[in-house]
Amino acid sequence: MEAYAQALVIAIPFFILLIGIEALAAWRMGLSINRGADMISSLSSGITNVIKDVLGLTVVIISYAWLVDHIAVVSIQATWAVYLVAFIVLDFAGYWMHRLEHEVNVFWNRHIIHHSSEEFNLSCALRQSVSNVTSFIALFMIPAALLGVPAQVICFIAPIHLFAQFWYHTRLIGKMGVLEAVLVTPSHHRVHHAMNDRYLDRNYGQILIIWDKLFGTFQPELAAEPPVYGVKRPVRTWNPLLINVQHLWLLIRDAWRTRSWWDKVRIWFMPTGWRPADVAQRYPVDQVDSPDQLQKYDSHPGQALLLWAWTQLGLTLALMFWLFLRIGELPFSQILLYGLFLVVSVFSYTTALDRSRWSVVVEVLKVAFGISMIGVQGGGWFGLESSLPMAGWSLAGVWVMFLAGLVWLRSTPPGSRQPEFQTGSPVK
């Protein structure tokens, strides 16, 4: 927990810097690849994901360490060659886990958040799930376990492998010559994120594209068919927590409503998007059958509400960093409570960004939650008062001002409509 949190303290500012550089480069090139609300949603999704991971809120069905202890044929030392083997096996496992999440109904709920943006930029890379509460990727790593690759090697390689998947979420880099034959490049991953029928469910590779070429899921990007980003059933919200349960809730309702007992069972394991015929007829859902039909979600928040949400995001990030810096000194109960407050904060300001009629109520509950935590700590905020006197009550004052600002924004006419941004062809 603590080691991962410290790694994130270093990695997250680096990611944010790259996102800023990409946005500046796109602006200089005259390309529209970002929308404010979409970026807030993406970054907020990343916050919820890392909080879940740092708190260890995942049930491991079977661990790699257990596999090594029980099925290893040989015992080997951690040489550079072993690290290379571990990287390749981890990438192989990632390919199959990724493919499973795309092609099986129940597992799509774990991954839909990552594809829910109707843009494609570096901030989209941070759209990660909180609904992947079980882990069984180790089942795809049996070859490494049989060879006796030490668990500590996998633990070392895993975050490197994960962070290395960030850079290719961009429209600003064209095709990369000979690297296209071996590595996952921005061009390959643009295809993966596209909703075009030709591109759908292709290019599952995470670092190496060779798995797609071996297993028949490779598709090159075509100049004649620019990718259109998003999902076939648009999520229509900026709230990452709602996105994380949308597909699951649809499956639950369909399983309940169908008259067929067989359909109640098989709906979970059918190809993604499958619905019982009787339910699909009685309860149709919005679906984009052609990229030409896509109308990008826009809640028309206006510039004032966007500024309010950006400021809320900035404060939430700052509080998250304080949690990560203090995580080794706090009892787990306090860490859990702190993490819950951050998640509630994300839920609140993204609900406001959707211009939901419940946004003020949710913000009131968040402020009450935060102030009660400060009161219990005698006016402090998890040790921050040692560096910033009156930190707790100062935070309370800021939250009350945010609440007052939201009440005022809700009482004014909505902002003028934001312009739709073109899909845009990749830079050649």
Regions found by a protein language model. Name each.
Residues 2-5, 56-75, 138-154, 158, ...:
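Juxtamembrane "helix exit" motif at the C-terminal ends of alpha-helical transmembrane segments
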Residues 20-40:
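Membrane-interface helix-loop junction between the first two transmembrane segments
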Residues 44-59, 78-241:
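Membrane-embedded catalytic scaffold of the fatty acid hydroxylase/desaturase
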Residues 8, 119-124, 167-309, 358, ...:
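Cytosolic/stromal cytosol-facing helical appendages immediately following the last transmembrane segment
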Residues 1-15:
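Hydrophobic transmembrane alpha-helical segments in integral membrane proteins
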Residues 16-24, 88-103, 162-174, 185-188, ...:
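Transmembrane alpha-helical segments that form the membrane-embedded catalytic/substrate-channel core
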Residues 6, 10, 33-50, 332-340:
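Loop-to-helix transition at the N-terminal end of transmembrane alpha-helices
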Residues 297-415:
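Substrate-recognition/cap regions that form aromatic- and gly/pro-loop-enriched pockets
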